[in-house]
Swiss-Prot record:
Organism: Bradyrhizobium sp. (strain BTAi1 / ATCC BAA-1182)
Modified residues (2,3-didehydroalanine (Ser)): S143
A Gene Ontology term for the protein's cellular component: cytoplasm
Keyword Lyase annotated: yes
Pathway: Amino-acid degradation; L-histidine degradation into L-glutamate; N-formimidoyl-L-glutamate from L-histidine: step 1/3
Cross-link 5-imidazolinone (Ala-Gly) mapped to chain: A142-G144
SUPFAM superfamilies: L-aspartase-like
Name of the molecule in the record: Histidine ammonia-lyase
Length: 515
C-alpha cells in the first residue's frame, strides 16, 4: 500500500484517485509548525474572557451560551456524541477513507486550531485500516457534513463503531486492534473535525472518478455501435470538431477515429451507401460525449479546489492571531459540481440507450436481424435487454434533477440555507451503477451486431475489446438466461476492461484525462 505525502493546498486529482483506490495519506511535515501555532491560539482563547464561537460557547442556535474553561473538553465530547445522528445504509469504505484523507488535508492547512495529535490519530487510523461506520444519510451540506463526520470522530475518541478486517466492532476495540488509544478532544477540536464538507466532497470525487471511467467505456461502445450499424466515420473528422472548438468534443472525435481506424466494415460501405446521414445517436457522439467530458473537467477543478480547502468554522488566522467566523462550511460548490456530474451521467446513458434501440430495430440497423438474433420469432434476442436499458435511463433522467436548489432551513432557522451537497453527491453512485448496466447492454448488442457483419471485421482495437468481452460472455445464438450476461457486461464496463483492451491494442492511451 503506497503512502501519499500531502502538501495541503497542492493535492492533485491523481493523488485523490490513489487514495480512493487504497493508498494512505500523511501530512507533509513542513506543515506542522502552522498546525501547532493555530492550536496555541485556540488554547489561549479558551482561557480568555472573550466569547469565541465553538471554543467557549455553545453551537448553532446555542452560540450565545458561555462555557467555562473547565467544561470545554466535555463540550467537545458532547458535540460529537449528540451529532452522531446518521441513518441509512453504511457508506462504502473507499468513500470513508477518502473523507478521512480530505479531513487530514484540511486540518493540515493550519487554520483549524487542532493539535498535532488529532491529525496523527486520523493518519494512523487510515494507515492501519480502522474504517469508521458512517451512515449515508443525515447531512444537508451546511453547516458542513455534521452527522457523517461526527460518526468518524466518534471512533477517534473511542466511541461509535468501525470496520476492522471486515468486522464491525466498537470504536474503542477498533482502535485497540490497531494499537491506538482514544484521544481526548481539546477546545474547538470536535467542531473542527465535524464542521466541513469532506463527506460530500469525498462522495462527489468518487462519483467524478466513476463518471470519467464510464465516459471512456461509452466512447468504446459508441465506436462499436458505429461499426455494428455500418455508420459513417466522417462526422468524427478533426476538421469538423476544430470548427466548433470545444476541447472535449475535439478529444472525443479523436478517440472515436482512433478506435475505428482500420475497420474493414467501414471500408466495405465507403462507396455505394445510399444513406446520406446517420442518426444523431451515432453521428453526434463527439458533441455529446465531448460536452460530458468538458463538464467533468470543470467539476474536477471545483472538487480538487474543495479537497484542498479549509471548510470548518471559525477559522484561525495564524499571521494575525485572530479567530474569525465565516461560512466556508457551506457546500454549495460541491452541490453544483455533483449536479453537473449527474447531468453528464444521464446524457451518456441517454445517447447509449438510443444506440441500443437503433441496433435492435431492423428498420434502422441496416440489414441486421430483428433484436440481433439469428432466428427471430423463435428467439427474442436482445428485445428485453433494450427495455432494461430504457428503464435504467429513465431512472437516471429523474435522478439528474438538481439537488442544490432544494434548500430547507435547519437549526431553528440559524442555518437557514443549505446546499444538499451530500444527497447530490450520494445519488451519483446509483446513477453510475445504472450507467454501467446501460453501457454493458450496448457492449453486448454492438459486439453481436459486428459479429453478424461477417466476413467483414472491425478494427484491431475494437476486435480486442470484443475478445475481452467474449472471455466472459459468449455470443448469443439462441435465447438463454440473460441476467448473468447483463451483470457480467456491467462488471466489465465498471472495471475498466474496455479502455484497457483498447489501450493495449493501440499501444498507447487514446483516452482524455480530466483537465
Amino acid at each position: 500500500m503506497s503512502t501519499i505525502i500531502a502538501a495541503p493546498g497542492r493535492v492533485s486529482l491523481d493523488d485523490l484517485a490513489r487514495v480512493y483506490a487504497g493508498a494512505t495519506l500523511e501530512l507533509d511535515p513542513s506543515y506542522w509548525p502552522d498546525v501547532e501555532a493555530a492550536a496555541a491560539i485556540v488554547a489561549k482563547a479558551a482561557q480568555g474572557a472573550e466569547p469565541v464561537y465553538g471554543i467557549n460557547t455553545g453551537f448553532g442556535k446555542l452560540a450565545s451560551k458561555r462555557i467555562p474553561p473547565d467544561q470545554t473538553a466535555q463540550l467537545q465530547r458532547n458535540l460529537i456524541l449528540s451529532h452522531c445522528c446518521g441513518v441509512g445504509p453504511v457508506t462504502p469504505e473507499a468513500v470513508v477513507r477518502l473523507m478521512m484523507a480530505l479531513k487530514i488535508i484540511s486540518l493540515g492547512r493550519g487554520a483549524s486550531g487542532v493539535r498535532r495529535e488529532i491529525i496523527e490519530q486520523l493518519q494512523a487510523m487510515l494507515a492501519r485500516g480502522v474504517c469508521p461506520f458512517v451512515p449515508q444519510q443525515g447531512s444537508v451540506g451546511a453547516s458542513g457534513d455534521l452527522a457523517p463526520l461526527a460518526h468518524m470522530t466518534a471512533v477517534m475518541i473511542g466511541e461509535g463503531q468501525a470496520f476492522v478486517d471486515g468486522r464491525l466492532v466498537p470504536g474503542r476495540e477498533a482502535l485497540a486492534h490497531a494499537g491506538l488509544a482514544p484521544v481526548t478532544l481539546g477546545p474547538k477540536e470536535g467542531l473542527a473535525l465535524i464542521n466541513g464538507t469532506q463527506f460530500s466532497t469525498a462522495y462527489a470525487l468518487a462519483g467524478l472518478l466513476r463518471a470519467h471511467d464510464l465516459l471512456k467505456a461509452a466512447l468504446v461502445t459508441g465506436a462499436l455501435s458505429v461499426d455494428a450499424a455500418m455508420a459513417s466515420t466522417a462526422p468524427f473528422r478533426p476538421e469538423i470538431q476544430a470548427l466548433r472548438g470545444h476541447p472535449g468534443q475535439i478529444a472525443a472525435g479523436r478517440v472515436l477515429t482512433e478506435l475505428l481506424d482500420g475497420s474493414a466494415i467501414r471500408l466495405s460501405h465507403l462507396e455505394g451507401d445510399e444513406r446520406v446521414q446517420d442518426p444523431y445517436c451515432l453521428r453526434c457522439q463527439p458533441q455529446v460525449a465531448g460536452a460530458a467530458l468538458d463538464l467533468l473537467t470543470q467539476t474536477a477543478r471545483t472538487l480538487v479546489t474543495e479537497a484542498n480547502a479549509v471548510t470548518d468554522n471559525p477559522l484561525v488566522l495564524v499571521v494575525t492571531g485572530e479567530i474569525i467566523s465565516g461560512g466556508n462550511f457551506h457546500a454549495e460548490p460541491v452541490a453544483f459540481a455533483a449536479d453537473q456530474i449527474a447531468l453528464a451521467l444521464s446524457e451518456l446513458g441517454a445517447i447509449s440507450e438510443r444506440r441500443i434501440a437503433t441496433l435492435v430495430d431492423p428498420a434502422l440497423n441496416f440489414g441486421l436481424p430483428p433484436f440481433l438474433t439469428p432466428q427471430p420469432g423463435l428467439n427474442s434476442g436482445f428485445m428485453i435487454a433494450e427495455v432494461t436499458a430504457a428503464a435504467l435511463f429513465a431512472e437516471n433522467k429523474q435522478r439528474a434533477l438538481p439537488c442544490s436548489i432544494d434548500s430547507t432551513p435547519t437549526s431553528a432557522n440559524q442555518e437557514d440555507h443549505v446546499s444538499m451537497a451530500a444527497h447530490a453527491a450520494r445519488r451519483l453512485h446509483d446513477m453510475a451503477d445504472n450507467l454501467a448496466h446501460i453501457i454493458g447492454i450496448e457492449l453486448l448488442v454492438a459486439a453481436q451486431g459486428i459479429e453478424l457483419r461477417v466476413p467483414h471485421g472491425t478494427s484491431a482495437a475494437l476486435s480486442a475489446v470484443i475478445g475481452a468481452l467474449r472471455v466472459h460472455v459468449p455470443a448469443l445464438e439462441n435465447d438463454r438466461y440473460m441476467a448473468d450476461d447483463l451483470a457480467k457486461a456491467a462488471a466489465i464496463v465498471a472495471g475498466g476492461v474496455l479502455a484497457d483492451a483498447a489501450r493495449d491494442a493501440l499501444g498507447r492511451d487514446p483516452f482524455p484525462k480530466l483537465g
